[in-house]
């Protein structure tokens, strides 16, 4: 009877360990799929992976989205031709931690280098509920100085596209990109 009990205990532990590994693997797969969707600027796939009330926290700044709003943000992001690279991805206690490198035309202009963030991804069932990002490599002074120079120059020379900075729609992104191009070619 002792041997039978020991075998049953081992089988039970093995079952629950495998079941936990499968759940953890699903969360890692969801996170990978999410960053792949962002990398491909696939707003439909990205919104399928988030909960109805999705929240991002970027260095303390909170933003809540519904599916439509997040799809619009992905379309805005797509204008700059982003590249999301997963540098590290792991799961512990139900939270996925990712180190992400992002670059695009906007970041290249404002920051010159990729922005690297550590991201803490929380889930609600099989959906991503929130992502908290903390900058690992981000030169705030360079970014803000470049952004302010761009905004001030556009206000003076092309006021028709002023407001591009806060318009996170595809049209707003196109105006942002146009502002960058106009600024870069200002001496021509």
Task: Locate each region found by the language model.
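Short beta-edge strand/loop motif at the mouth of beta-sheet-based domains
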Residues: 62-74
């Amino acid at each position: 009877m002792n041997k039978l009990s020991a075998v049953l205990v081992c089988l039970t532990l093995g079952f629950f360990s495998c079941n936990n590994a499968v759940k953890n693997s699903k969360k890692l797969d969801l996170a990978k799929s999410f960053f792949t969707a962002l990398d491909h600027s696939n707003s439909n796939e990205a919104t399928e992976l988030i909960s109805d009330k999705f929240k991002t926290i970027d260095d303390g700044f909170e933003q809540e989205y519904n599916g439509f709003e997040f799809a619009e943000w992905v379309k805005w992001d797509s204008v700059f031709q982003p590249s999301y690279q997963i540098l590290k991805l792991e799961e512990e206690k139900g939270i996925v931690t990712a180190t992400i490198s992002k670059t695009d035309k906007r970041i290249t202009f404002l920051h010159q280098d990729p922005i690297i963030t550590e991201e803490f991804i929380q889930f609600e069932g099989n959906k991503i509920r929130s992502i908290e990002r903390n900058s690992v490599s981000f030169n705030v002074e360079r970014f803000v100085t470049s952004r302010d120079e761009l905004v001030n120059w556009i206000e003076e020379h092309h006021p028709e596209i002023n407001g591009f900075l806060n318009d996170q729609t595809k049209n707003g992104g196109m105006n942002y990109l146009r502002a960058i191009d106009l600024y870069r070619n200002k001496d021509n």
